[in-house]
């Protein structure tokens, strides 16, 4: 399994909520046409956890997790017209100069899940059983 994460800021000349709506309802439709992606997760940053973690503001407005079967599937997707369409749509809401992407290796340290795969807590599990 190959996982890629992209981090980015929204365009400064657009309202952040409008960009979130575009990203969720329009950009995602284009993204999902890339059939080589096994998983596509949008993470919309909505604010710092607390004042201590706010620093000089949020460094990014969002990130995307994209999962592929293997490196060949990743390469094939990157070379596809569907990915080109996704790249062409990016500047409609994203500050492309802020875009960072990279391969990541996740290490799941805890994933309590319900029988159907939904994340849950121990308390939730007692209610499901």
Task: Please state what every model-predicted region is.
Residues 1-129:
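Macromolecular interaction modules
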